């Protein structure tokens, strides 16, 4: 990305002005104002042009925005929807995308289109577009396939997703850890630990290293399978190996403890990490309190919320209302306790 930016900086003002003059002189149903535009403005212009069927302008805008340092986003092809115009719009895009400047500009436009097609549930069309990329000798990368694998594994179409992997390999595109994580998360969400272990084996066989999301999925899987102790062991391994622990990983453990009825351990768990990361504290204490309230464990929830107040942690609207309605009237009693008595009080309440 930095190399691209340095390249753009080297472009002379005259060169950029020349591109803008060309854009203004070309026929278009969409008026393109001169000057540097924001990413959202480019997306708006592209969607206006696409909706009006002016795909020559779509092509020019896709070219010009990259030259001007404005990259495509998930909103770039928002005009492409599951309506009567879908087929004709897609064919027009397939026609103009090969005409975009080669290299990053064209590759990025294709990748964004594939992502849009997957969001619309058009997996077959996304694979057709990948075929276009391959025929056009564009460098296919694992990230090109990520939206497809994500979409299929979320819908638990695992066999279909593995067929896509076979197609990747036939085009000499290797799997990266992110691609494997989609399979891992799908299996772990359903508590399928054996299948998850098989995916982990494949990750290592391919020479990849599990990342934070890989371990996050494993913790989720252990909790969904009712093996909270195993989940906590995985979390400890992450810490020992220096792998960044995501906030969601803590949330998985808290969920497993609360759903297993281990309310005291839930508080003990969040207290063990308290004071190291203010945002983590807010997330973990708030998440635990919310879970307890939903399970109507009001007494335990009051203890957690009091802890949040004492630590000055951010509190959501629902917890704030819960606190104001149930907890603040007991503040005087809590304030009268010294630290040792307070810890004893919490232990007695939770056991």
UniProtKB/Swiss-Prot annotation:
Q: Which InterPro entries match?
A: Pentatricopeptide_rpt, TPR-like_helical_dom_sf
User: Start-end of the PPR repeats?
Assistant: 106-140, 141-175, 176-210, 211-245, 246-280, 281-315
What UniProt keywords apply to this chain's record, in alphabetical order?
Answer: Mitochondrion, Repeat, Transit peptide
The record's section on PROSITE patterns has: PPR
Once renumbered to this chain, the transit peptide range reads: 1-27
Localization? Mitochondrion
Q: Is Mitochondrion found in the keyword set?
A: yes
GO CC terms on record? Answer: mitochondrion
Disulphide linkage map: none
Q: Which superkingdom, per the lineage?
A: Eukaryota
Q: Which family does it belong to?
A: Belongs to the PPR family. P subfamily.
How is this protein named in the record? Pentatricopeptide repeat-containing protein At2g40240, mitochondrial
Native organism: Arabidopsis thaliana (Mouse-ear cress)
Its lineage opens with: Eukaryota, Viridiplantae, Streptophyta, Embryophyta, Tracheophyta
